[in-house]
Amino acid sequence: MQLKYLRTLLEGQEQIQRIAGLAWSPNQQRLAIATADRHILLYDDAGERRDKFSTKPANPANGKNSYVIRGLAFSPDSTKLAVGQSDSIVYVYKLGESWNDKKVICNKFPQASAVTALIWLTSGSIIAGLEDGKVRALHSKSNKSQSLYGGDSICISLAANTKGTGFLSGHNDGTIIRYFMTDEATEPLGRVVQHPVPPFALAWPQGGFCAGGCDQRIVFYDSMGRQLRTFDHSRTEGEREFTVAACSPNGQAVAFGSFDRIRIFAWSPRQGAWSESATKEVACLYTLSSLLWRRDGARLALGSVSGAVLLFESVLRRTVWQDKFELIFVAPSQLLVRSLTEPSQALTIESQLGLEIDDVRIMGRDNYLVARTEESLILCDLTRNLSSEVPWTASGHHERFYFENPTVCLIFNVGELSLVEYGENSILGSVRTEFVNPHVISVRLNERGNAKENKKLAFLLDAKTICVVDLISRMTSGQISHETKIDWLELSETAHKLLFRDKKLRLILVDNYTGKKQTLLSNISFVQWVPQSDVVVAQSNSNLAIWYNIDLPEHVTMQSVRGEAIEVLRENGRTVVRSQDGPSEHNYQLDEGLVEFGTAVNDSDFGRAVHFLESLGDKPAAKAMWHNLALIALEDGNLRVAQRCYAALGNVSKAYYLAGMIQQADEFEESSGSPGILCPEVRAKLALLGSDLRTAERIYLEQGDIESALKMYQQLGMWDEAVALAERRGYNRIAELKQQHMDYLLSSEQQEKAGQVLEEQGDLQQAMSLYMKANKPARAARLALKTPHILQDEQVMLQVTEGLVRSELYELAGDIAHRLSRPEAALALYRKGGAYARALEIGRVVAPQEVTALEEEWGDWLVSRKQLDASINHYIEAGATQKALEAAVGAKQWRKAVQIAKVLDEPELIQRYAVDLAKHLAFAGDLDGAEDMLVRANLHKDAIELLNRHGKWERAYLIGEKHLKAEQVRELFVQLAGTLEEQGKFRDAEKVLIAVNEPDLAIAMYKRRELYDSMIRLVERYHKDLLDSTHLHLARQLESRGKLKNAEMHFVASGDWKSAVHMYCSSGRWEDGYRVAKLKGTEGASQQVAYMWAKSMPTEGAVRLLSKLGLLDTAVGFACDSGQFEFAMELCKFAGKPTDEVHLKIAMSLEDEGKFEAAEAEFLKANKPREAILMYQHAGDWQAALNVAENHLPDAVGEVLIGQASAALETSNYKDYEALLLRAHRPDLIIEHYKQESLYEDALRIAEEHYPSALNDLRRLQAQLQRGQAQAQAGEDAASISRSYLQKAAEFAKKEQFRKAAECLMQIDSSNAEDASTLERALLRAAEICNQFLEGQDAQELAQSLGPRLLAIKQIGPAAQLYLAADMPKQAVDVFIKTEQWSKARRLAKEIDPDLQLLAYVEQQQKASLKHEGNIEQLADIDIVSALDLLAEHGEWQRCLEKAKGLNPALLQKYVAVYAAQLIREGNCTTALGLYLSYGAPPIEAHFNIYTRIALDCLALREEQTERGTTWRQLRDFLFRLLQSLKATPAQSQTKFAASMEQFLLIAHYYATRAACKEVQALQPVALRLSLALLRHTDLLPVDKGFYEAGMDLRQAGREAEAFVMLNHYLDVCEAIEEGSGQLVDHSDLASTDFPSSVPLPEDIHLKNDPSLHEEVREWVLAVSMDQQVDQQLPTDDRGLYESSLGPNDLPCMLSGFPVRGRQPVTFQGSSNQVNRDVWSKFSVALKMSPGSGIADIISFTEKWQGAANYVMH
C-alpha cells in the first residue's frame, strides 16, 4: 500500500483547533468536515470547498459555545448528514442532492448524556455512543430511537463492519462489544474481548477486528476475540499513543493514526495474515483526531488536533491499459477503472470472495472487463456498471470470451460453454459444444418485459443439431435435427420461436412449443428479428421479406431492395432496414403499425390491436393478423374480440357459434353475477371449439349432464366414445345406445367397423361374414387364426387366402398355410412377403441348407427397403462380410463398419471404404484407429494427410519414413510446412519441420518472418552453442535497421551489454545507454556512461544531469583521474562547488611528474599546505618545506624541524640534531634520546641549559644505575632474612593470626631462603596452616598463590590436598593432570564429582596431551578415532587405514575418502583410484563427488601416463564395481549420478579397448575408430585432448583431410583456453557429426608440459591449410553424416564406438547393446593370434558387463 499526498484542505493552526469529525458520502461526491468552531465544511470530489454552514446548540439559551461536535456521518443515500454533539443531541441535516439545495434539520434526537461517538450504518440506523456508556440506535425515517445496550463505562469509539449490518463499540475500561442490526449474523453478540487499554483506535476489517490505544500496541483479533497478531511499537522512537483507526471499504486494509504518523496494515489473501505495509510521517501534523477512507478506497482523509485536514491517495499500484483506461489497485481484491478518453466516474471492481486479483483485461470494444483471481473470475459491464464474480478454477488462461450479447457473457473453455449474466454471481448455465461462433449461439434473458422468468439458450450440439435449453430449470426444452449444416440461428425475444439458416442458405422456422419445423425462404443472405417484436426481416437475392405475423409464416410481405441488408434499427417510432450498396447506403422503412400490432398482442392490448387491424382494411397481411389475434383472444377468454376476428375473416360459422356462446355467457353473468366465461356451457363449447373433447366431456360430467356429453359425441359421429362413456358411467339406456350405434354403422356401409363391434360382442361367425363382405381379408384372417373351428372350413380359408394374396398380405397367408400344416407353401409365402424371421423358423426345420441363403436374402431385402443398419447382422450371419461392410458404411454404422473392416485381411477389400471410416474414427477422436485403417488399406499418403490435419506430425513422419521414400517424405512435409507458413500458422509449421528433423528450416522461417523470439527459442533448443552468436547477429541486424530497443534485448541476452551501451551512446541515446549500464553492468560502468553523457553536453546541462543522477562528485573524480582538469573545474564552477579537490588532484599529478613548485601552488590553491609540506619532506627539500610552513602553516614549523632533526640523527649529525630540536623548542626529545642511549652526561647538559625541570629525574636515574652496579658487587646474608620470617610466622601462629602466619611463611623464596630444605619446610608449613585453620575466601586466596609454588618444588600431594581443603576440586585435579598422574586424577575426579563431569574433563585433557606428544598407541587405547585423526594429520595413511580396517567399514571409508580427497588435491588421481580398488567404493552419496573427480582426472591423463593402458583398465573396473553397488541399492539405481557413472564406464571401456587394440597391428583401425567415437563424449573428456588424439591417429593412418579438421579444431580450442574468454569455438566444420558443440573448456591445454609437440601440430596444420590438394572437410556417408556419428535410431558398437550397421550384429544376453559382427570377428582372431595381449581382458570384461555374446564364428 502506498500513500501519496494529494492536497491540504485545511491548514494547521498554531493552537489547538481539533477536527471534530470527517464524513465522506457513499456516492463519493461530498466530504464533510466538522471544525473546532462548530462549523460544517463541504468539499466536492475534487477537493474544492463548495459549502459551509454552522450547527446549532440543543438549547439556544446556553449559547453557541456551549457544545462541541463529537461525530459526523452521512446517510446511505448521501443526502443527509448526522451531527453528534456534546450537549446531548444528534441533529440530522438534509443536504439535498445538489449543492444549491437548502440545508434543513429533518431529525432531532435528544439523548440522556453527551454523544461521544457516531456512525450511520448502511442498513439504515444511526448508532450513537454516549458518555454514560449506552449505545443507542436512531431511526431517521420514524424519528424514533432505542437503547441497544449499556456499557459499564463511557463509549469512546464505534466501528461498523464492511457490510454495514453490525458494529463494535469500544469503552473506556477496555471492553469491546459487538452488536448486529440484522438477524443474519453468524457471530455471537455481546462483549468479545477485554482490551488492555481504552480502544480509542477501533476498526472492524474482514475476518476479525483490531484495536489500538495508549500502550502503542496494535492488536488484531479474530471473530471470536482471540489474538491473531500484535504489532508492538512501544520501543519505536518517536511513536506515541494510537488515537484513531479507519478500515478500508473492502476490509482488507486498516489505517491507524498517532502523533505525526499514519500506519497502514494490509491483509494478504494469499498468506492469510496481516502485515504492516506502509508508514507515512507528516511533520507538524500532531496528533490525529479523525481518519476516514473514501467509499472506493482510493482516498484517505485525515484531520488533526491542529485543525489540519489532508488528503492522501492510497493505492497498491496503478497501470494504464492501452492509453484508454487507468487501472488503480486500491487493495489486493479491489481496483478502480477510470476512462482516460471520456470524463466519467471511476468504477469499482471488487472480489466479493476477498481474493487477490491477479490479471485484469479490458475486452469487447472496451465495454467489458475481465479479471482473474486464484479461484474466481470477475466479469464487468463497464457501460451499465454491472459486475459478476463466479467460481472459476485455474485453466491456464485458455478461455475465450464473447461479448456480443449485451446481457450475458459467453465463456468457452476446453469444449465447455459457460454463460454468466452480468450482475449475477453464479454461472447461469454450462453446456458442452465445439461450436462457439456467436452466430450459432442465441441467448434470451427476460426480454420484452415478461413477468415470468424466461431464460433460454439455443446452441449447436453438432453441425446439424440445435439444442434449446431452459436456463432456469437447466433442462433441455427442445432438440432440432437438420439434414444440412447450420451456420446461423437466433431465438425470438420471447424464445417462443427459433430461426436458423443452413449452409444451403435456407431459412427455417421452429415453434419451440410444438417442435414444428417449417422452411420459410431460400437463398437467404441476411435475417434478423426486429427489436422488441416478433417480426422477422430477411433478404433473398434482391428482395426483402417481412413476416409481420410469424405465427402465419405463409403470409409474407416482399419488397425489392438495393444492395445488401446489414441491420434493422428501431428507434423514435420508426423501424428501418439499412442496406449497403457499394459506397452508398439505403434505408427501407417497415410498416410501423404492423410491427406495433405484434407488440400490442404481446402486451394483451386487444383494443389497440383491433383498432389497428380495422384501419388496415383488406390488406393481405391483415388476414393473417386477424387469425392470430383470434387465437390469442380465445386463449385469453375474450369471446367478443374472437368473434370480431372471425367475422373479419369471413368465418361465419365460428362467428355465429361465438355469438351463441356470448349470449349464454351474458345470461349466466346476469343470473349469477359471476363472469360469463365461467359458465359451464360456455366453457364446454370453448373447449369444443378448440377440439378439446375430453375437457368438454369433463365439464358436462362435472355438472351431471351425461346426456349432453353423449349428444356431443353422437353429433360428431364418435359412437365408440359415446358407448365407452355410457358403459363407464353405467348409463341405463346403454342397450338402446348400442343398437343405435349398430344401425348407424350398417346404414353408413361401415361393415368392417360393424364386424369389429360384433367380434367384441362374441358373434364371430357374423363378424367373419361382415369382414368378407367388406373385403377385409386381413381382419378375417386374424379372426380365423384366433378361432380354430373357422380354420376347419376349407372353403372359407380358401377365400381368405386368395383375398390375402390379392392384397399382397403374404405374411398372414403364410401364417394360415403354416397353421394348415403346409410348411413349403408357408415358406414360399413368407419369403414373398418379406417375413424372413418366420421363414427362418420354418426353414431351420424344413430346409436347413437354405438358412444361410435366407439370411443373405433377408439382408438384400432389407437393403432394398433402405434398412441398411438392420441388414448388417444378417449379412454377417450369412458370411457375406463384404456386403456387411457396404451396408454398415451405407447406414453410417461406423463402429460396426470398423469392426467388420478389421476382419478383412486384403487391403483391396477395404480400400473403397477406408477413407470414410478413417474420417469417422478421426471425428470420434480415435485417431489411432483411423491411422491403422488407412495403413492397412495401403493408403499411406491419406494416413499422412489425416495425421497432419490433426497436428500429429511425428506419427505422420514415422509412417512416411516406413512406407515412402525418404526424399518423398521430406519433400511432402517441407511443402506442408510452407503451406502452413503462408497461412500464418507458424507454430504448426514449426512442429512439422521439427517432426522431419529440420529445425534449421524452422529457424530460417522465423528469421524470414522476423519472429525473433520463436527463432531464439529454437536456436536455444537445437543449437545452444550458437545462442549467443545468434543473439549478437540479430542485435547487429536490428541495430542497423534502427530498432534499438529490440537490439538491446538481444545484446543483453547474449551477455554483451557493453555493445548495447555502445550502440545507444553512438546514436546519441545516452539515457538508454545509462539505463542498460546501470541495470546490467557494474556501478563503475554506469558512472562512466553518465560521465561520457555529460561530456557530450554543454557544461551547464552536464551539471544539471550529473546532479540529477547524484554523480557530480563522481564525474569530477573521473575528469581528474583522466587528466581533464579543465572540465572538472568547469563542473565545479557551474555547480557552485569548491574547487579544492580539483586543485588537490592537479597538485598530486604535478607531484608525480616532479614539478614540485607548480604542485606547491596547486596545493596552496586547494588550501592544503600540509600536503605541500609533506611533498617537500618526501623529496628531502627541508628548506622548501620550512618556507611553506612558515608562510602558510606556522603550526607545522615544529613538525618540519623535528622531521629534519630525525634525518640528521640518521646520519649521526648530533650537532644539527640538537640545533634543530632546540629551534623547534623540543629539548625533551633530545633528553629522551640520550636517556635511551644511557648518555646521562649529555642529557644533564641539555637539561641544565634548556630543560631544568628534568634535572631531578635524570639525577635519580643516574643514582639508581650506580646503586645497581654496587649491589652486583656486594651480596646480602640470605640466611638471616629467612630466619626472621620463620620467627615472625611462629609469633603470628601463637596469636592465632593464621593467615598472617601463612603469608609470612610464603615470603620465603629462593632468593632469601637459607637452602632448599628451608624453602620446602616453610611452604609445607604454610600449606598445613591453610588446611587446618583457614577456610572460605582466605583459604582460596592463599591456595591460589601457594599451590603453584608447591607444585614447583614437586610437592604434588600437599598441593592437591591444599586445593581440596580450599574447596577447589578442579584445581586439585589439575595438579595431577599437570604432573601426568592420570590414574590419580581419574580416581580423584570420581571421588569428588558424582556427575562425572570432572572425569570427562580428565579424559579430554589426557587425549589432548597424548595427541600433543604423538603417543598414538596409548591414545588408541583411549580414543581410537582421535588416534586415527592424529595418524591422518601426520600423513601416516597406511597405519591409519590398517587400524580403521580392523574396526568397521564405515570408519574405514571415511578415512579412505579423506585420503583420496588429499590425493586428488595433490594431483595424484591414479593413487586415489588404486586406493578405492583396494578398499572398495561404497555407494555413499557423500563420496560421489570424489568418484566423479577421480574419473574426470584420470580421463584427462595423457596416454603416456597410463602405463600402457593399465590406468584405463583400473578405472574401468572401479566404475564397474561402483555401478554394481549402485544397482544393488534401489534408492541409487536410477539417480542422475548412476547415469553419469554409466557414461564414465563406457568412456573408460573405450580407452581400455583402444589401448589393447594399439598392441595388435590388425586392430589399429579399430583403435582409430575408438578415438573418433570418443569425440562423442567431449562434454566429459577434455575437449582438446579428444581432438588431439583423434587428429594424430588420423594423421598416422594417412587420412590427412580428416586429421586437418580435427587438429585445426584442437588448435581453436587451445586458443580459447589460453585466452580464457569462455567464448564458444566455431563448430561449423563439424556440423555433420554428433560431437557436442557446447562443451566446458579445461583450465589448461592438454600438451601444456610438451609445448614442442603443440608447436609441431600447429606447424603441420598450417602447412596442410596451404595445400590445395587436401579437401579440408569431413566426408559423409549415405546418411549425410560423418562415419562415426550416430543417427536417431543407431546404437553404438560396444567395441568400436561406431554405429552398429550391417546384418546380424552380435548381441548380448544381459543387455540390448550390440557389436558389429566384423569387429567381434577381428577381436576373436586377434585373441588367437596374440594371446599375450590385452584383448582377452577386453572380451572377458565386455561379456562380464553385457552378458554372454550370441556369436558363433564361421
UniProtKB/Swiss-Prot annotation:
The keyword Methyltransferase is assigned to this record: no
Disulfide bonds: none
TPR repeat segments: 623-656, 690-723, 748-781, 807-840, 852-885, 1041-1074, 1140-1166, 1167-1199, 1211-1250, 1282-1315, 1698-1733
Listed GO CC annotations: axoneme; ciliary basal body; cilium; intraciliary transport particle; intraciliary transport particle B; non-motile cilium
SUPFAM superfamilies reported in the protein's UniProt record: Tricorn protease domain 2, WD40 repeat-like
Swiss-Prot/TrEMBL GO biological process terms: cilium assembly; intraciliary transport; non-motile cilium assembly
Subcellular location(s) of the protein: Cell projection, Cilium
Family, similarity comment: Belongs to the IFT172 family.
Protein name: Intraflagellar transport protein 172 homolog
